[in-house]
């Protein structure tokens, strides 16, 4: 990986994602050795597959596995079981100029009482973030406060319509009957509460991406909130998954809508998290896969998305949420070419807590605005999140190998220093 020299008025920092001293300066030797053990375990695909089957079963049957999970994979990828525990991690990150994106990691509790409780918890997170300058964003999943089946039905109706996404969405809402109409009003009220509180507290809301078969109403609801709250500053961000072959065009159409409606488009760019599930469903149901044909196509669209956003930086607030070293370096190069300040309010970088510290901490050291995505919640509630992390790291052999090589390199450096 080449070293990129960055010219700026205040200093002349150099970014190298090979610098493990900077990457792991927040970690003790004990913490690094534990991380080495976890990533080494994830290198064994059969072990991960076994864990994916056994862990949910063990939790469901109340077997005493919480302690083991808490000390291993949970500690590596999750901030804590409560908001209060997570604030300790956020404060530790602050010492290294790394910010935190808080994510209340609860998924799939399908009843109105739990939807209201989840909404209340999102509000509590926003209120905390509003008092902490080191927590500029919080993340929400719309499925945390909306029935999956309701979103699925809306999605199917939207797809049948004609015209822009918003026209099709509003027509789908008009066609709702009786209880579903009331359900939509409750959904909109929850989303408005969250975004209004965030706007008042100066906290950004990152709306997580969902499966393709419920994504249309999520996109439309997010666009509706951006049209309401993003007039003067960017409060609401949509998450755009570039492992889908249609998302670069969607990004451009979203920007056009922002221009026409005079709001700032919030765009958190990711590669994606549901690839295997998407391919499997497409094959089972006999429709064309929404997934890119290969990794090169995904990388091409992701980097093109970064360039598009930076070329329209007055209208787009960009979050580069990536573990790909080239994409992060590419974004920094584009910023420099366009003479953007390192802490430009419309450019932010982010990586998951527990991964790619070499990117996060070296970007922070160089002066860029960067954060760790920091989920929290009871172990039983964040199991879906942890299962995805294990699955992704196992399937991304290169990523796991990269994490291991960097950790080993730093342990060796410390041993010899």
Language model regions located:
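Positively charged, amphipathic and often flexible ligand-engagement surfaces
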Residues: 2-417
